[in-house]
Regions:
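Active-site capping/gating segments
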Residues: 163-203
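Conserved beta-strand signature within the Rossmann-like core of class I S-adenosyl-L-methionine
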Residues: 153-164
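Conserved SAM/SAH cofactor-binding pocket of Class I
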Residues: 50-133
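Alpha-helical transmembrane segments of helical membrane proteins, especially in multi-pass transport
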Residues: 136, 140-143
Length: 203
């Protein structure tokens, strides 16, 4: 097992182990994650999702968009269960097979989240304090989703690869926003973009 922070409880570690086992099992049937990443799942998926959670401000409502195979959304739900006042977690996913997996994983890990089976752009604004999305779309598209679903003053968290500066430059053509690149703990070329103040350009 990849090293987890020492403040993660044994119960949470067991829930994360259960999640990874489920991902490995279901990936053989539906395309949850790239099969090549399953063996290195602690680093590629669990730790990568954990850093998203650790970077976020305390939230009353967290929305994970395009949750897919459960990262970071299911990990967020598992970690929030440790908190005295856990956030309401909403997972948005349009693929019904993946929604079935998400509900199964929530049941088997004992985590709590709402699963919305719909396209992100068709979901009524969620008013979330924190919005996250991983490996979903270019930044300019993600900003549109975040602008729709973030509460005023909310934060968006988007893991991005080595070309993140180009994505920021492209997004700045249509959006005003602040972006803080935080070095990834799982990939030296990647960052976690912490974004706020999202507004479309006038006209």
């Amino acid at each position: 097992m990849e090293t987890l922070p020492t403040d993660v409880s044994r119960e949470t570690r067991e829930r994360l182990e259960t999640l990874l086992a489920l991902v490995g099992k279901w990936t053989r049937r539906i395309n949850l994650v790239a099969p090549s990443t399953v063996e290195d799942g602690w680093r590629r998926h669990i730790l990568d999702s954990l850093q998203v959670h650790r970077t976020a401000p305390a939230a009353r409502h967290w929305a994970d968009l395009g949750t897919g195979g459960g990262f970071p959304g299911l990990v967020i739900a598992i970690l929030e269960a440790e908190r005295r006042a856990p956030a309401q977690v909403t997972l948005v996913e349009s693929d019904r097979r993946k929604c079935t997996f998400l509900r199964t994983a929530l049941r088997e890990t004992g985590a709590h989240a709402s699963v919305i089976d719909a396209r992100i752009e068709s979901v009524p604004p969620l008013g979330a304090d924190v919005v996250s999305a991983r490996a979903l779309a270019p930044l300019d598209t993600l900003l549109g989703f975040a602008h729709r679903h973030c509460a005023p003053g909310g934060t968006a968290l988007f893991p991005k690869g080595a070309r993140w500066p180009e994505e920021i430059a492209a997004a700045e053509r249509d959006w005003t926003f602040s972006a803080e690149p935080i070095p990834s703990i799982t990939d030296p070329d990647a960052v976690l973009l912490r974004i706020g103040g999202i507004a479309p350009h006038a006209g």
